[in-house]
Amino acid sequence: LDKRVAELHKNNIRVRFIGDRARFAPLLQKGMTEAEAKTADNNGMTLVIAVSYGGQWDMAHAAQQLALQVQAGQINPQAMTTDDFQQLFQSQIQMSDLPPVDLLIRTGGDFRISNFLLWQAAYAEFYFSDLLWPDFNEAALDAALESYANRQRRFGRTSAQVEAHHA
């Protein structure tokens, strides 16, 4: 881990781990925390590494954190609108400080998201490839990006609504 983090740091890449770290040995947890701290100020790219992560776990964990805040009297759910709650919930999920997912590439020929980034990928565009991950190369990435570039991002709106908004 140290060797890889040094290389990532040298290339101005920020490292983030998402998932249930409590399932790992304390030494590995410490290594994850140190890697994030060492690269925290890097702004070239962000590498997000999912460890013991599941979208359902992520949302349940966020709900649990909010329930604890309600119990402590820090949040009054009766005084909140649905939009307020949605923003508060968003602040508790993993990757809350990162932009939403734009493109999710699924390799291996499967047509499912497999419990991955359920909240964060709400308006993501999906690209499915028959290639297995080890075989997914630069040409395959270019094909995925080209497909993405030719799509109309609607974010829950109809094509007519998007076109009217841009007119």
Sequence positions of predicted segments:
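Flexible, compositionally biased loop and terminal segments
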Residues: 1-167
